Amino acid sequence: MPKALIVSAGNNANEYLAKHMVELGYTRPVMAASGGEARRQIDTKDFEVIIINAPLPDEFGHELGTDAVTKTDAGVILLTKAATADQIADKLQEFGVLVLGKPFTGAQFRQ
């Protein structure tokens, strides 16, 4: 069964993201509330997809994204405010991190 990691400090965002991940076939996404917690999960489990809802309480999240790309085979998506997404998308995409600006539609997320 494919595994997904959702890194987000917000309960509402967690529920929303988990719902969409279930629709994509990730039946029990693993949740992490911080970058540190996510790194511990990444060190002990294999994930197919890692979703980072920036900012996180202990870091912005772009560092976690680049770390995850270099340490795993997972696809990594960073969710951030649209204005910030425009500023960081090119740099992060060089590393292989997909950046999606918030707000976004369910259809955009599932793409």
What are these regions (language model features)?
Residues 63, 81-99:
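Alpha4 helix (beta4-alpha4-beta5 surface) of REC/receiver domains from two-component response regulators
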Residues 9, 79-84, 103:
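Conserved active-site segment of CheY-like receiver
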Residues 18, 31-49:
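Acidic, metal-coordinating helix/loop segments flanking the phosphotransfer/catalytic sites
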Residues 49-72:
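Conserved phosphotransfer microenvironments
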Residues 87, 104-111:
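C-terminal output helix
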Residues 34, 57, 82-86:
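Negatively charged, flexible loop motifs adjacent to catalytic sites
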Residues 11-30:
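Two-component/phosphorelay signaling modules centered on CheY-like receiver
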Residues 11, 33-37, 107:
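Acidic phosphotransfer microenvironment of two-component signaling modules
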